């Protein structure tokens, strides 16, 4: 509607200028008529699109029914083909045509040579039209037709044996608890050692982390028996150390540190560094073990700067000029303002936009139909075939269309990390304004959480069944709704932006009651749960500064989550022109964790 209003305004402005011309005395008489004609044309286009959408859905339903009932008569084929042909100008006409041919080919008999040839001819003609995104589907159908008459031979006895062997190995991998028995009973000459290698890390997870008399010696014997290479044994040791890293046995801890020094594997060294940070022991020897690549990370440059008293200010100053959480920490350590350069994203001219008109119409219609996943697939194909500047312009276009998740996606594909207005669009602003009334949560923080959780995809769903913009679990949503007298009718409500934002911000406010004005703890609890945060605080025993606590969060995901949310909050303050933008609150900085 915003676009329609803008176009209308432009037309009326142009017509008004025309009416003011002394050489067009009759133009003012026709202005109202021109306005009515334009509005009528817009309305007729809208009605036409609604009708086409209805036909699209009806034909799609017919094709689904044909497949389900295994009936696709010639009469039904003719009806559906006629209806598809009537959809001239509809963005998804060729999608439906591909679906029609997919259904028709499924019903072709092997001996129907004439029908197969007719299909090949028509599909070849469609391929020649080179219709965006749909042509590969037609090509795939042609390939399917070319192999339709090929008879599938039964598997040979050798293949059957191979399949049985693979299935047996898969069963072994799926039951890692049995690995010790498999090693004891199996002959190294008959069982592929990759089965053993792949299953070992999962076998370790079946063992208690704090088991007594912990030793790698027995697994070294396995490795010798199965003639594992040095690199394979190294991978086993890494898996073993990762599994039992926090085992409290002092002999194991001594062996662990020796192995970390020998293996010099960054993920283990970084984990040992985090342990040293929360234990408040020396860091330099562990920092020196890092590879050049890891040493270049902002996080370890920050900690190296804190250890180097002589060059502390110089290193922190250099870091503070970059973008990110640790540059913000560096500026805070230096008690300096954090300066941020935000480039302006380019936009399409009308002429530049024309080549994408068909694609934009397709994506618009898919989104209208709720096919956001397919719309994103086509958006990604588009992004992968244009240059960096065009990717930026596409991101800006998507943002202006309120395709917020596609704008973010384009910024990620382009690696446009400095273009914060594209990475962090001002999405669902009115909903946040409404939801945050009378809550002790800032708009920029709530939006930072949503951006980190879903990248502004309202249909996002995690493997744990967290849903929507702020990725709420149905159980959390239900409890939050009850505690705050908010409407909630079930899981599907979480895919509705307003409902999700109401519940997500209410949950943030509940966490704020537990951790007043401390986004570090609120964000960590929102991601990992308040119980885990409680355990981490208990382990820290009120001895850690803000930077030490964040660095020692044991979960990789939560650690990155907290850092991103704090950074996004500050970026949103800049983008929303907040006065005196604040990186950290006094409560966050002054607290010992």
Curated annotation (Swiss-Prot):
The cellular location(s) given in this protein's UniProt record come to: Periplasm
Family annotation (Pfam families)? SLT, SLT_L
* One MF annotation (Gene Ontology) recorded for this entry: hydrolase activity, hydrolyzing O-glycosyl compounds
Where does the UniProt annotation place the signal sequence?
1-19
According to UniProt, the reaction catalysed is:
Exolytic cleavage of the (1->4)-beta-glycosidic linkage between N-acetylmuramic acid (MurNAc) and N-acetylglucosamine (GlcNAc) residues in peptidoglycan, from either the reducing or the non-reducing ends of the peptidoglycan chains, with concomitant formation of a 1,6-anhydrobond in the MurNAc residue
GO aspect biological process, one term: cell wall organization
Name used for this protein in its record = Putative soluble lytic murein transglycosylase
Its gene is: slt
């Amino acid at each position: 509607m915003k676009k329609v209003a803008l176009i209308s305004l432009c037309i009326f402005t142009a017509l008004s200028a025309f009416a003011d011309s002394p050489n067009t005395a009759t133009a003012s008489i026709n202005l109202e008529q021109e306005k009515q004609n334009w509005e009528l044309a817009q309305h007729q286009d809208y009605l036409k699109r609604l009708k086409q959408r209805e036909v699209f859905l009806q034909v799609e339903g017919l094709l689904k029914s044909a497949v389900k009932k295994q009936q696709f008569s010639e009469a039904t084929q003719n009806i559906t083909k006629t209806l598809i042909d009537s959809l001239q100008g509809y963005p998804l006409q060729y999608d439906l045509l591909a679906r029609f041919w997919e259904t028709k080919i499924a019903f072709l008999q092997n001996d129907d040579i004439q029908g197969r040839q007719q299909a090949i001819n028509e599909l070849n003609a469609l391929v020649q039209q080179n219709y965006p995104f749909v042509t590969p589907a037609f090509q795939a159908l042609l390939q399917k037709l070319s192999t339709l008459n090929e008879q599938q031979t039964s598997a040979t006895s050798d293949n059957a044996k191979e399949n049985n062997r693979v299935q047996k190995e898969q069963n072994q991998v799926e039951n890692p608890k049995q690995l010790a028995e498999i090693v004891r009973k199996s002959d190294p000459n008959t069982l592929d050692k990759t089965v053993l290698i792949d299953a070992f890390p999962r076998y370790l997870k079946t063992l208690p982390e704090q088991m007594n008399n912990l030793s790698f010696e027995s697994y070294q014997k396995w490795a010798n028996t199965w003639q594992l290479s040095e690199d394979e044994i190294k991978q086993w040791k890494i898996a073993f150390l990762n599994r039992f890293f926090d085992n409290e046995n002092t002999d194991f801890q001594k062996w662990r540190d020796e192995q970390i020094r020998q293996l010099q594997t960054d993920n283990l060294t970084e984990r040992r560094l985090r342990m040293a940070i929360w234990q408040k022991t020396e860091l330099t020897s562990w920092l020196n073990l890092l590879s050049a690549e890891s040493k270049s990370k902002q996080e370890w440059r920050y900690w190296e700067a804190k250890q180097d008293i002589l060059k502390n200010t110089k290193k922190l100053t250099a870091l503070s000029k970059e973008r990110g959480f640790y540059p913000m920490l560096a500026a805070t350590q230096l008690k300096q303002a954090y300066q941020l350069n935000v480039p302006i994203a380019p936009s399409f001219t009308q002429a530049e936009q024309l080549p994408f008109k068909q694609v934009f119409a397709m994506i618009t219609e898919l989104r209208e139909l709720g096919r956001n996943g397919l719309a994103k697939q086509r958006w990604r194909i588009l992004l992968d075939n244009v240059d960096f500047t065009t990717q930026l312009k596409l991101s800006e276009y998507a943002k202006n269309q309120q395709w917020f998740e596609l704008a973010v996606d384009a910024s990620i594909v382009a690696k446009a990390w400095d273009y914060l207005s594209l990475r962090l669009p001002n999405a669902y602003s009115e909903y946040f304004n409404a939801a945050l009334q009378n809550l002790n949560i800032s708009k920029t923080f709530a939006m930072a959480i949503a951006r980190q959780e879903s990248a502004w995809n309202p249909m996002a769903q995690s493997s744990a069944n967290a849903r929507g913009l702020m990725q709420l679990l149905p159980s959390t949503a239900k409890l939050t709704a009850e505690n705050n007298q908010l409407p909630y009718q079930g899981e599907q409500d979480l895919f509705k932006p307003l409902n999700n934002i109401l519940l997500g911000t209410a949950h943030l406010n509940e966490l704020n009651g537990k951790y007043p004005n401390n986004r570090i703890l609120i964000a960590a609890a929102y991601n990992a749960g308040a119980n885990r945060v409680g355990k981490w605080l208990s382990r820290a025993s009120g001895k850690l500064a803000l930077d030490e606590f964040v660095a020692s969060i044991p979960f990789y995901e939560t650690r990155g989550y907290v850092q991103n949310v704090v950074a996004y909050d500050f970026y949103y303050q800049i983008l929303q022109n907040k006065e005196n933008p604040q990186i950290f609150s006094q409560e966050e900085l002054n607290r010992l964790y």
